[in-house]
Regions:
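A detector for short, charged/polar N-terminal pre-domain segments
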Residues: 1-2, 65
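Active-site beta-strand termini and strand-to-loop segments that position acidic
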Residues: 43-47, 109-112, 121-122
């Protein structure tokens, strides 16, 4: 049976769509969508996957792993070298929560809007 659905887009809530899109563009190499503006910005991968960022008034960033402000979304990215990727992403504006449950297998970081994401080895 062929798949019923095909993932074409992922959209994250945030306070500043353009700033969050800039972070992910530098981190992933996705291309900025020409229709991006201050309320909704997007990035497109070569195969068409769209990553969107929408402005939400009163946005409250997740405080992972605090369940009172849950993670709201979760992205996983594979990398060749955890330490190198973490260093570059921190320079780009990512954060590193104190709680790290993955040991040497994965790292949890947060984007500039507070969304947690994981880096895992290829």
């Amino acid at each position: 049976m062929p798949p019923l659905m095909r993932l074409t887009a992922i959209t994250l809530d945030c306070a500043d769509p353009q700033a969050l899109a800039a972070f992910y563009a530098r981190a992933t190499g996705f291309e900025a969508h020409p229709g991006s503006d201050t309320d909704f910005a997007g990035l497109t991968r070569e195969d068409g996957l769209f990553l969107g960022f929408q402005r939400v008034d009163g946005y409250r960033a997740p405080q992972w792993p605090d369940p009172s402000l849950p993670q709201q979304s979760h992205l996983d990215f594979t990398v060749d070298d955890l330490d190198e990727a973490e260093t570059v992403l921190l320079e780009l504006g990512a954060g590193r929560p104190e709680y790290q449950p993955g040991g040497d297998r994965w790292r949890v970081l947060t984007d500039p809007a507070g969304h947690p994401f994981c880096l895992t080895l290829v």
